[in-house]
Amino acid sequence: MTTQSSSSSSSLPSSLSSTPPLLASNARCKVLRTGASSKGKGKGIKYPVDRISMLPDEMLQKILSTLSTKDAVITSTLSKRWVDQWKRIPHLCVDMRNIMRTNPTSYVHELSFRFAESMTKTLNNHRGHLESCTISHIQFIFLFIDRWIQTVTREKQTKEITLVNNIGCMTPFVRYNSLHLSPSAFCHPSLTSLSLTRYKLLEKAFKNCCNLKILKLYDIMSDVSVLSNVIKACSSLEVLVLQITFLNQASALKIENKKLEFLQVTWPCLMNRMEVNTPRLVIFDIKSIYCFGYSVEAPKLSMFKRDYWVGGMSYPHLSYHISSLAQEKIRIWLELMVSQIYHMKRTGSLSVSVDVRNPNEVEILKEVLLLWDGEMMDLEILFKNNNAPIEEGESFITGGARNKWWDGEKPFPDDFFRVCTVWMYNFDGSNEEEFALASRFVTQGTVTEKLMIKTSTYPPVKQLMTEAKVAKLMELPKGYEYLDIECF
């Protein structure tokens, strides 16, 4: 996964990204000349320009949140109206990268300390609570990090913290890579999301860290035992992203969490073994794994049949048990799935369980398929049967509320999605939606090599009926002339 950007705009809501720039409050009016007015032709007409200062405080604070913290503080010099506005913004971003980029190396150490001291004052002067805080720092100010973390958690009750260590290189022998923080530094009840980039992981900051629901670790160095203990201490995790370089591969990495729903793993170095035991897991996103073996106990993903484990390496693969859960949760998952490692496009295969009668689930499937720019290797589809129970928090649209997604202006799948081989399980030829999906795969050239439909496990009568429907699929005009359609 690509190292997360620490810019203020990337950590803020996309809805604010198009906010117009601030206008100077002391520029009260401006002379504009116009030739369109017969009365005012050739005369100077004064129009008030500083309408932005008349906006409500909440709106001004949202606008300021789109700026870096340094720029937001500078706006306090515009007028009395702006003096305290920055002090209540819900998002703060401390970004020190420009110190290294724009100054000689001999001055970086001194300037870093000056900047850190000013940011300490800024944090102390801020009023109210924070939604998020991003700290992108360089190695010279590690002494300030612990103090800042305590301030933003205990005093500001920040919900989301992002820490990025901007250093030139990563080696296990450089001490400043270690994240030396106070015991239980990340254990404040308000903190629910934590992202760390380029650190050597230590356990003490995570003691009894049951408050975290989201943990993202990018370019992290850690012993397997330390990482296992950190995951165990974060007992309420729902989302876990691991991009790890292990220092000690002797033991097995254990991920045992009763609440974990999303797991994404990437590591370029060989490890011994990974053991996953997560009863609520619905997404297992493997970017790359090199290890002697792994085991996964996840009931919602156990029905998938395909195996992409070959010779100590797993091909990139995404397993997703689709359900119509809260949109905010699904949005977070999709954002993590679309993020790429080292700017590489998503490749490999996809396994999904989906009810194509449910428009909500079909919409989610559309979004997932859009993650592939190029041709997908394998697509495994497990159709949910009609008696599948509705999960907690899931909605289901029936009757006239259903829309036929294979009709209309934007049919699904679109004309650009391509996959080499599709494997279908629980296919019911009498189901209008399932047959329509298979038909589109055939006729518009979605599948380029094989469409494989599992029928051998059906009772004799159902097997005959299903294979008769498959025969109808074979009679359809093929988007790819040499497409092979088989029952197995």
From Swiss-Prot:
Q: Which SUPFAM superfamilies match?
A: F-box domain, RNI-like
Q: Which part of the chain is the F-box domain?
A: 49-95
Enumerate the CDD domains for this protein. F-box_AtFBL13-like (cd22160)
One Pfam match: LRR_At5g56370
Q: Which domain of life is it from?
A: Eukaryota
Q: Where is this region: Disordered?
A: 1-21
What InterPro entries does the record tag this protein with? F-box-like_dom_sf, F-box_AtFBL13-like, F-box_dom, F-box_SCFL_complex_component, LRR_dom_sf, LRR_FXL15/At3g58940/PEG3-like
Q: Which PROSITE patterns match?
A: FBOX
Q: What is this protein called?
A: F-box protein At3g60790
What is the organism lineage in this UniProt record? Eukaryota, Viridiplantae, Streptophyta, Embryophyta, Tracheophyta
